[in-house]
């Protein structure tokens, strides 16, 4: 059975049922072809406000549902994602430009997020406390209420599910606002999956929209927690707005992650790892290896081999061809990437591969001898670009790596893992991989960054998800009513 066996989702938002949005609708466009491949609802502030009211009304009943029933719903959601994997992967290829491997990975991880969330529903949420009075004293975790999720375009299925599933598991209602550029993969798919899985009406709602919808979601008094994944620039604005309303906000933001290649490494393995870390999904991943810090003894050979690999990677429409890289999401992103490459070359970097494009298809690019002030090194590119900086010592590596304001992921490649850990201890980062590249994700592992990469929030794993989507409540209980001196 097709996930979208009817066109009821077309030009609609999901409020527990598919319905037109007060804000109208918008086209769903394939970045590979430029063709309109569907239409999605486009929520405005009125839509968000009404949805938040419905969510607040529905949340208490969902929280009162037994943990077994919530877990069963999430297990069914995971199974539906797997059963409809081929159809979902086709949408990921067409709508987000994901190559087949990346599309399959998203389905796998999204299903895993649902299964892990199902297990979360039965976890103990509290602890018994010591008390100096004749009473029972304990702390417990209670649902936050209504959680607003703002998800990006780049890995839309994973980055929506990562917040939606655990928030539902612990008894919250959820409003999901996917990026309008990936309203199907990041929104409609999950709406239909959770509808079929049995989430009650009003508990999960999906409303694509632009700035107006996002601002209302952050401001609405019925929404108590915001989970935002996106750029650091927008994340700052979301954090500032949430602060005005004393609202909890989880910010998973950009990265400019360093990949350190030491001189004792297996060079061919390092080149394979570096290419994957920088070019996977056209570099449109927050954890992408954005800076290659290569020991000067092996730098010439590393750059030569990395450039050869970049030149050999096929680029094209992932829905029609066997390709390693698909298109960038839109012309604005392509122009930003190309500007950062050309200005870095003007600043002294050497272009050794790529640096060209046709339409939205950008060739994997290698820049050698970049400096710390080159745009492609200093900031997040979010494109298939591997800037290489040559380093001469461990002190250089640590100083250069931690000079960036970002701190999401760190990869260190070396024949001596303990040497790698010693370096890692000197570089602030939310994630560290010794002898692997910077891009990885597992539903059981905490995920998040420091500095400009986020608020240190974590997604994944029991403790992180409970902390993210519940509030701590202190409770005391005694047999008789207390008496006082007056």
Where are these regions (language model features)?
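N-terminal Rossmann-like NAD(P)+-binding subdomain of aldehyde/semialdehyde dehydrogenases
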Residues: 1-135
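Residues at or immediately preceding the N-termini of alpha-helices
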Residues: 31, 45-48, 67, 85, ...
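Residue-level signal for inorganic ion chemistry
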Residues: 34, 70, 92, 114, ...
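Rossmann-like NAD(P) dinucleotide-binding subdomain of oxidoreductase/dehydrogenase enzymes
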Residues: 126-269, 391
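Short, well-ordered beta-strand elements within core beta-sheets of diverse protein domains
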Residues: 36-43, 58-64, 149, 259-262, ...
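Conserved C-terminal structural/oligomerization subdomain of aldehyde/semialdehyde dehydrogenase
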Residues: 33-39, 223, 260, 314, ...
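Structural signal for hydrophobic packing residues in well-ordered secondary-structure cores
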Residues: 59, 63, 78-85, 89, ...
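ALDH superfamily catalytic-core signature
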Residues: 233-371, 395, 434, 481-485
């Amino acid at each position: 059975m097709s996930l979208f066996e009817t066109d009821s989702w077309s030009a609609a938002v999901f409020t527990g049922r598919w319905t037109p949005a007060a804000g109208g609708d918008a086209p769903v466009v394939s970045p590979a072809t430029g063709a309109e491949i569907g239409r999605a609802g486009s929520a405005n502030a009125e839509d968000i406000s009404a949805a938040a009211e419905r969510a607040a009304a529905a949340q208490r009943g969902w929280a009162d549902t037994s943990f077994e029933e919530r877990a069963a719903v999430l297990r069914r959601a995971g199974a539906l994602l797997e059963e409809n994997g081929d159809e979902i992967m086709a949408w990921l290829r067409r709508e987000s430009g994901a190559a087949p491997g990346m599309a399959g990975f998203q389905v796998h991880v999204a299903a895993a997020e649902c299964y892990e969330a199902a297990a979360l529903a039965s976890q103990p949420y509290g602890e018994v406390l010591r008390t100096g009075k004749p009473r029972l004293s304990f702390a417990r975790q209670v649902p936050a209420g209504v959680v607003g999720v703002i998800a990006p375009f780049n890995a839309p299925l994973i980055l929506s599910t990562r917040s939606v599933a655990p928030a539902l598991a612990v008894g919250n209602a959820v409003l999901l606002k996917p990026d309008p550029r990936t309203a199907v993969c990041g929104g409609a798919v999950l709406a239909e999956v959770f509808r079929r899985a049995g989430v009650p009406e009003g508990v999960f709602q999906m409303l694509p929209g632009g700035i107006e919808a996002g601002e209302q979601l952050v401001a609405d008094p019925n929404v108590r927690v915001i989970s935002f994944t996106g750029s650091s620039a927008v994340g700052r604005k979301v954090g500032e707005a949430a602060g005005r309303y004393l609202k909890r906000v989880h910010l998973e933001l950009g990265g400019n992650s360093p990949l350190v290649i030491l001189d004792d490494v297996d060079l061919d393995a390092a080149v394979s790892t570096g290419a994957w870390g920088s070019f996977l999904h056209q570099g449109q991943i927050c954890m992408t290896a954005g800076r290659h810090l290569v020991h000067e003894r092996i730098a010439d050979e590393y750059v030569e081999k990395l450039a050869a690999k970049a030149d050999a990677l096929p680029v094209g429409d992932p829905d029609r061809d066997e390709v390693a890289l698909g298109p960038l999401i839109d012309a604005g992103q392509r122009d930003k990437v190309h500007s950062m490459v050309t200005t870095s070359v003007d600043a002294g970097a050497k272009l050794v591969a790529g640096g060209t494009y046709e339409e939205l298809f950008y060739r994997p690019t290698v820049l050698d001898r970049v400096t710390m002030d080159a745009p492609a090194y200093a900031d997040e590119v979010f494109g298939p670009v591997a800037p290489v900086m040559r380093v001469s010592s461990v002190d250089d590596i640590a100083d250069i790596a931690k000079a960036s304001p970002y701190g999401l992921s760190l990869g260190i490649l070396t024949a001596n893992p303990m040497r790698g850990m010693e370096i890692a201890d000197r570089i602030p980062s939310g994630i560290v991989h010794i002898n692997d590249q910077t891009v990885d994700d597992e539903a059981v592992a905490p995920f998040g960054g420091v500095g400009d990469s986020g608020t240190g929030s974590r997604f994944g794993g029991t403790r992180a998800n409970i902390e993210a989507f519940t509030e701590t409540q202190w409770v005391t209980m005694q047999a008789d009513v207390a008496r006082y001196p007056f």
